[in-house]
């Protein structure tokens, strides 16, 4: 086991604060509409240019072990805020730095760190309640566009694209971000349910231009096992042929003679069919088959419920207006399922989301809700170079998270004003002793810091602007993008309540931990031994004989 350095008290805290400052100073230059870029070196390929706080934070690793501990703790603030709210990482870092900086002064003056922490917690709880009070729900797509634009560093086109996507697929719909092929951003909307399984044989293709299978008003057969024997399928195929409509088979797999017979019938024009594998794996596959059954008004043919393929009738089959199958995707448009049954299924999945413990499960369940309730929108990000594309894509993803947060918990005035106004709820607070009062003061000071930093990054005098904004009331604030004072909500400078709340809570949580730290243990740096001398050129003796 390697030897450890154990550092106590002020010496440990001072080193950790140095680390906090190095990381926070690198991150906070990106805050606000006039925030600067940070260039990140890559071990291969060109450098990455970013204005995303969490991307900058993740890159920072300091040589000094104690400084690095401080930096890593603040990095945790940024990444936790990003995970919970999807945005607000820079604001959280600025708040954490301020709470640590102010708090350390009081700790150095001999105040009790535990009481400081209690004061900080009390102030944060009061501020969060105040933020919830002033929060307004997002009602219009204009507000959604404004939130998206602010989060994407005042890029209005990104905000508009996201608002348009939400209009098309609903607030529950899936919106994904992909690399575009042109210079302009594009929005592609897939209505209906899409899942990532394509045709099992290219011989099913009936639209050679698009290389897809198009089935108009088809029946849908859902089976949870493999189909390899054509004899099992014959009864249902005959019934479908009599009805004169196409058939899509969704099963675990269709292989051997069953697939060959379907292909031959398709080529000869006897029966228009297509087959795809069921989406997902294991229990998720069963659940998704059930989703498709409810969407199309059919039944999953499973031995568990006493149904077999040879006894299946047309009543067991689902129906849809149109189905399009590509090489990798299948889209079911306008399923014939009962609206009440679909709504019931969505409620059931939402209940599962509430109980889900892992982020992965939650994400997959949300996708299922979106596929049943709305549709899928793809924002294709356009840019001139790959470096610009990466940077823009990161901003679009941030904006997307911010708009989802705004839909979830509502909006507050942006530009650091919501936190500044929430100070009113704290200023009357008193703790149980002077040390707790000091903790409350720490938060009061920290809550004006985001506005100060936004103004500094815009090249203005922070104290003058903060004083003027404090004189105003309500939504009155400073719009750093235009350099004007006024009603920020009317100007479209909005922040999601969830982002502001999460940033403050996470910053206070980690900063309090640091204030109550009294000992740091780190590995002793290894002494680097001097490199060995290179081997000499032997056999060079006897120079005299050469003279």
From Swiss-Prot:
ATP binds at residues 30-33, 51, 87-91, 415, 479-481, 495. GO terms for molecular function: ATP binding; ATP-dependent protein folding chaperone; isomerase activity; unfolded protein binding. Its main location: cytoplasm. Pfam families: Cpn60_TCP1. Keywords: ATP-binding, Chaperone, Cytoplasm, Isomerase, Nucleotide-binding. It is an enzyme of class 5 (isomerase). GO terms for cellular component: cytoplasm. It catalyses: ATP + H2O + a folded polypeptide = ADP + phosphate + an unfolded polypeptide. InterPro entries: Chaperonin_Cpn60_CS, Cpn60/GroEL, Cpn60/GroEL/TCP-1, GroEL-like_apical_dom_sf, GROEL-like_equatorial_sf, TCP-1-like_intermed_sf. Forms a cylinder of 14 subunits composed of two heptameric rings stacked back-to-back. Interacts with the co-chaperonin GroES. Belongs to the chaperonin (HSP60) family. This is Chaperonin GroEL. It comes from Cupriavidus pinatubonensis (strain JMP 134 / LMG 1197).
């Amino acid at each position: 086991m390697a030897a450890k350095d154990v550092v106590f008290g002020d010496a440990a805290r001072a080193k950790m604060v140095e680390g906090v400052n190095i990381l926070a100073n690198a991150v906070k230059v990106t805050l606000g509409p006039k925030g600067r870029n940070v260039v990140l070196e890559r071990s291969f390929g060109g450098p990455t240019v970013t204005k995303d706080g969490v991307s900058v934070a993740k890159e920072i690793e300091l040589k000094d072990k104690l400084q690095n501990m401080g930096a890593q703790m603040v990095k945790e603030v940024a990444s936790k805020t990003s995970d919970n709210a999807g945005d607000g990482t820079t604001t959280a870092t600025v708040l954490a730095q301020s709470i640590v900086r102010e708090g350390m002064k009081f700790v150095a003056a001999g105040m009790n760190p535990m009481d400081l922490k209690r004061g900080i917690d009390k102030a944060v709880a009061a501020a969060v309640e105040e933020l919830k009070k002033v929060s307004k729900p997002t009602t219009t797509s204009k507000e959604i566009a404004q939130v998206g634009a602010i989060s994407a560093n005042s890029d209005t086109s990104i905000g508009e694209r996201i608002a348009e996507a939400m209009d098309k697929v609903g607030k529950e719909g899936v919106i994904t971000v992909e690399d575009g092929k042109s210079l302009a951003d594009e929005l592609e909307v897939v209505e209906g349910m899409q899942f990532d399984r394509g045709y099992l044989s290219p011989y099913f293709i009936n639209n050679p231009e698009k290389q897809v299978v198009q089935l108009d008003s088809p029946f849908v057969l859902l089976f949870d096992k493999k189909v390899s024997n054509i004899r099992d399928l014959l009864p249902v195929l005959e019934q479908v042929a009599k009805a004169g409509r196409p058939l899509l088979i969704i099963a675990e797999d269709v292989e051997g003679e069953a697939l060959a017979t379907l292909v031959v019938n398709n080529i000869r024009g006897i029966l228009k069919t297509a087959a795809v594998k069921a989406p997902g794996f294991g229990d998720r596959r069963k659940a998704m088959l059930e989703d498709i059954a409810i969407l199309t008004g059919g039944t999953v043919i499973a031995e568990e419920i006493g149904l077999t393929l040879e006894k299946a009738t047309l009543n067991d089959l689902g129906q849809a207006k149109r189905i399009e199958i590509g090489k990798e995707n299948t889209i079911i448009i306008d399923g014939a399922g009962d609206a009440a049954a679909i709504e019931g299924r969505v409620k059931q999945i939402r209940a599962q989301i509430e109980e889900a413990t892992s982020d992965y499960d939650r994400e997959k369940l949300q996708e299922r809700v979106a596929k049943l309730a709305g549709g899928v929108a793809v924002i294709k990000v356009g840019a001139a170079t790959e470096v610009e594309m990466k940077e823009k894509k990161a901003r679009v993803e941030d904006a997307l998270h911010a708009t989802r947060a705004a839909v979830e918990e509502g909006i507050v005035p942006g530009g650091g004003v919501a936190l500044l106004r929430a100070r009113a709820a704290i200023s009357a607070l008193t703790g149980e002793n002077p040390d707790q009062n000091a903790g409350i003061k720490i938060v009061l000071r920290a809550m004006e810091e985001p506005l100060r930093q936004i103004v500094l990054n815009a090249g203005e005098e922070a104290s003058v602007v903060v004083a003027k904004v404090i004189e105003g009331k309500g939504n009155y604030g400073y719009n750093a993008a235009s350099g004007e004072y006024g009603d920020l909500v009317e100007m479209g400078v909005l922040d999601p309540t969830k982002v502001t709340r999460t940033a403050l809570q996470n910053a206070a949580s980690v900063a309090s931990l640091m204030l109550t730290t009294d000992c740091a243990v780190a590995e002793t740096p290894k002494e680097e031994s001097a490199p060995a001398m290179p081997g000499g050129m032997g056999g060079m003796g006897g120079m005299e004989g050469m003279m």
